[in-house]
A protein has these predicted regions:
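Conserved RecA-like ASCE P-loop NTPase motor core of nucleic-acid helicases/translocases
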Residues: 56-65
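Walker A/P-loop
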Residues: 24-46
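SF2 helicase catalytic motif II
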Residues: 109-153, 158
Length: 248
């Protein structure tokens, strides 16, 4: 069982801030922490704190994949020191977002009788601020979970979507439209704290680059060749959307 003194500084801060927000009467908390920082341990510790304070009865965790859901199950079971498999005597269950649609009405009627904490891992996979503007996972959350959860905790290491749709349950600033996070722990701070390593970025070249010059076209075997044998600059390459689609 993990005590608060064993938490990283950011984890302890986040637990304290989430608890304060919940106790103030607000039921949703959004934590953005860089991948690998320990979001699952933080959320499990918060869940245990809420249990110890008598603020919740049950916990549900949802994740985008079976492997992540299994990891959450193990972390919560160890931290809370209780089975976390959804069976008799368990304090909760860890499932995938895909499974929400297969949980029947009887399940939700039973769950709504209890004070429930729902943890959404990698919440950015779920979009929508209303059912008609949501993907299937976001729609299930809005329809099934939003109304029965006593508290919700959203976790994300990369809180943005390429389709620009809002993340489900998230709050955005007006008029800027920026995501409002209740707690943020970025990569720079994680590197400073020796929580994460400094990433190494590798640019993979493209072996067939073609540019148009007037009525003609020229091909190059690499970015280096393109830069040396044409008037194209490096900035031209990285700011060209079509070019970047073929470069990792």
């Amino acid at each position: 069982m993990r005590e608060h003194s064993m938490l990283r500084k950011w984890q302890a801060e986040c637990v304290a801030q989430a608890l304060k927000k919940y106790e103030s009467g607000t039921n949703h908390f959004f934590c953005q922490a860089t991948p690998g920082a320990g979001k699952s341990i933080m959320s499990a510790t918060l869940a245990k704190t809420l249990l110890d304070k008598g603020m919740i009865d049950l916990i549900l965790c949802f994740s985008p994949s079976v492997s992540v859901a299994d990891g959450m199950r193990a972390t919560f079971s160890t931290t809370i020191n209780c089975p976390f498999n959804g069976c008799l005597g368990s304090i909760g269950q860890s499932l995938t977002y895909q499974s929400i649609q297969y949980l029947g009405d009887h399940f939700w009627r039973t769950i709504e009788k209890y004070r429930l904490l729902v943890v959404f891992d990698e919440i950015h996979h779920c979009s929508g601020d209303e059912p008609d503007r949501a993907n299937i996972w976001g729609r299930q959350i809005l329809a099934r979970i939003q109304g029965v959860a006593t508290y919700t905790l959203a976790l994300s290491g990369t809180p943005w979507r390429s389709d620009k749709f809002p993340i489900v349950l998230a709050e955005y600033s007006d008029p800027e439209g920026k995501l409002v996070c209740d707690y943020q722990y970025g990569l720079a701070q994680a590197i400073t704290d020796n929580v994460c390593r400094k990433p190494k970025l590798v640019l993979v070249d493209n072996e067939h680059l073609t540019i148009s010059e007037g009525s003609g076209r020229k091909s190059f075997a690499s970015i280096l060749e393109l830069l040396k044998q044409s008037k194209t600059s490096y900035q031209d390459v990285i700011h060209n959307v079509q070019a970047m689609e073929y470069i990792l």
